Amino acid sequence: MNILIANDDGVFAPGIQALADALKPLGRVVVVAPESERSGFSSALTLDRPLRPIQIAEDVWAVNGTPADCVYLSMNGLFDFEFDLVVSGINRGANLGDDVLYSGTVGAAFEGRLMKQPAIAVSLAGPDVRSYDHKDDYAQAAKWVHDFITKGLPALPPRHIFNINIPDVPQLKGTQITYQGRRAQSKPITSHVDPRGRQVYWIGLAGEAVTDPQRIASQIQSDFFAVANGFVSVTPIQMDATNYAVLEDLQASLG
């Protein structure tokens, strides 16, 4: 099996290194990732300048582009073989609820799925994760991904991926299939004056989770709920954002 690994934290991030080490027993693992952090780039592609892939080690490449660029290049001519699976991560921080709209980790996985291959996005969720700088900090999460793939990925419809969030806890309680939760409105921007007297702003402080159960038949909980209670969250998400439930009503009202 040929496995492509990408991320949005950059090619030298400890999460992607741990993931590559864990998956090597499953086949050939190729890492193609941004040369520096590209968090929040979603599925963006670079169209205004050339991309420059540089091989920095055996089966490890750095690209001066976005996470989706890395996957697009890898599956459209950078290599003379095809990949069987795309894994994006392990992200340094959660991608829960509305986070998936912005996530470069998720964007890279979606790009792989657009190329007709199974794809999963993996994130490590916890308050201390941003300070982790060694691949051993991601070892438990990486092993979970290895075991998940080894068991055989459940089949998903076209244009769907798995968004997986693994809580940063000493002992995982198990795995839950979840729906995508949502956050409250993002926290306000913060502003200050820089040393040159210019007003500058910071954005990106995520809002808290909203308790908003979806109307589904079973007792499936949100991704937020699973992670908060020590479970790995596995959420099937799709590219098609059409609201089919209101299509006919909307057509009737505008027709």
From Swiss-Prot:
Enzyme class: hydrolase
Family matches, as InterPro entries: SurE (IPR030048), SurE-like_Pase/nucleotidase (IPR002828), SurE-like_sf (IPR036523)
Record field: catalytic activity: a ribonucleoside 5'-phosphate + H2O = a ribonucleoside + phosphate
One Gene Ontology term, aspect cellular component: cytoplasm
Annotated function: Nucleotidase that shows phosphatase activity on nucleoside 5'-monophosphates.
Molecular-function GO terms, alphabetical: 3'-nucleotidase activity; 5'-nucleotidase activity; exopolyphosphatase activity; metal ion binding; nucleotide binding
PANTHER family to which the protein is assigned, alphabetical: 5'-NUCLEOTIDASE SURE, 5'_3'-NUCLEOTIDASE SURE
Gene: surE
The EC number(s) this enzyme carries: 3.1.3.5
Keywords: Cytoplasm, Hydrolase, Metal-binding, Nucleotide-binding
Cofactors demanded by this protein: a divalent metal cation
Main location: cytoplasm
Domain of life assignment: Bacteria
Coiled coil: none
Localisation: Cytoplasm
Protein name per Swiss-Prot or TrEMBL: 5'-nucleotidase SurE
Gene3D superfamilies reported for this sequence: Survival protein SurE-like phosphatase/nucleotidase
Keyword set includes Repeat: no
Binding site for a divalent metal cation: D8, D9, S39, N91
Free-text cofactor note: Binds 1 divalent metal cation per subunit.
Protein family according to the UniProt entry: Belongs to the SurE nucleotidase family.
